[in-house]
Regions:
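Nucleotide/phosphate-binding sheet-loop regions of phosphoryl- and nucleotidyl-transfer enzymes
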Residues: 1-178
């Protein structure tokens, strides 16, 4: 079977909620990191699972940076990110008519459905046609423990493939960001 790297939607930090974010802040001794993860999760869940888009959230981030006189997200502190979490949850409430889900099981079910739904997104359809991947094959959903790429100067993120994503050639390749 062929892979479709980068075609299916992804939701990071699933399971975070108002209680878990406090536990993450305590465990890592880094409230800024914990609230950054939570605001990213709310944004991704709202976009991928609920299909609200990213613009509402990006506007709030930009407004916060302007208020604080900073240029980059990384310059926002823990209190700024806590405020963004409140604002993001308010956007969710206004757009969905319900509170952001606090139950990790509910979050997981929504995320799994969204990944299956992403099999039919335009990007995936074009990729399948270009690579002659039958629609009937469907897709799988992977759920795995989070490996944080934003927890400080000694963390990063990356992806590895056993095939060249562009050609399908059998060779190990990947990329990373620090």
């Amino acid at each position: 079977r062929q892979s479709m790297p980068g075609m299916m939607d992804t939701i990071l930090n699933l399971g975070l909620n108002d209680q878990a974010v406090e536990g993450l802040a305590k465990k890592t001794n880094n409230p800024r990191f914990a609230y950054d993860c939570y605001r990213r999760f709310i944004q991704m869940y709202s976009d991928v699972v609920m299909e609200l888009g990213k613009s509402f959230f990006e506007e709030r981030i930009d407004a916060m940076k302007e208020r604080k006189g900073v240029k980059q997200d990384v310059e926002l502190d823990a209190n700024d990110l806590k405020e963004l979490v409140k604002e993001f949850k308010q956007i969710y409430l206004e757009k969905q008519g319900e509170e952001f889900p606090q139950d990790p099981k509910e979050q997981l079910i929504g995320a799994v459905k969204a990944v299956f739904r992403s099999w039919d997104n335009p990007r995936a359809n074009v990729y399948r046609k270009m690579n002659e991947i039958p629609y009937e094959w469907g897709t799988a959903v992977n759920v795995q423990q989070m490996a944080f790429g934003n927890s400080g100067m000694r963390s990063g993120t990356g992806v590895a493939f056993t095939r060249d994503p562009a050609t399908g050639a059998k060779k190990l390749m990947g990329e990373y960001l620090i």
